[in-house]
Regions:
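Short acidic-hydrophobic surface loop/beta-edge motif
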Residues: 4-12
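Short, surface-exposed, charged amphipathic helix/loop patches that serve as local interaction elements
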Residues: 2-3, 18-143
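Short, isolated positions in well-ordered beta-strands
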Residues: 13-17
Length: 143
């Protein structure tokens, strides 16, 4: 198989996650589109609390779907994505769903890794140290 994989750890549990295939990415985008339509349906007359609840639920469902699609690669002949999705929703805490979602998106190239303080580019930090300080004040005329 050509798909990248890595270990996902949550507390004392560990499992293998996979990047999404091209077809799964298309299916995931379609799922997200349906979720967005559900969240925005009849949104004009609802309270802020109702909208917040809809958005949180949608975020959790989208994360659980992504995880289910990834986990499916552990045994393609076994449990289907829909069953895995329901298992993730009913058995995983929201924090674990969020962490796994981010890890799968990074693995799948759906998010760009963030460099910590330009650690990968030592020239950038050297330039920042030698640069003149930035100020909102107008420069004084030379005398």
């Amino acid at each position: 198989m050509f798909l990248k994989k890595e270990k996902f750890n949550w507390q004392t549990e560990s499992l293998t996650i996979f990047e999404l295939s091209a077809l799964q990415r298309i299916e995931y985008i379609t799922f997200m589109t349906t979720e967005e339509k559900t969240v925005s349906a009849d949104s004009d007359g609802i309270s802020d609390q109702e909208m917040t609840a809809r958005l949180i639920g949608s975020n959790i469902r989208c994360g659980a779907r992504l995880i289910a699609m990834s986990l499916w690669h552990n045994d393609p002949a076994g449990t289907d994505v829909e069953t895995l999705y329901q298992q993730v929703l009913s058995g995983w805490p929201p924090e674990a769903i969020g962490k796994a979602e981010m890890q799968i998106k990074l693995l799948s190239g759906m998010l760009v890794p963030v460099d910590d303080d330009n650690a990968a580019d030592p020239d950038a930090s050297a330039e920042a140290k030698s640069a003149e300080p930035v100020s909102a004040e107008k420069p004084l005329p030379a005398s």
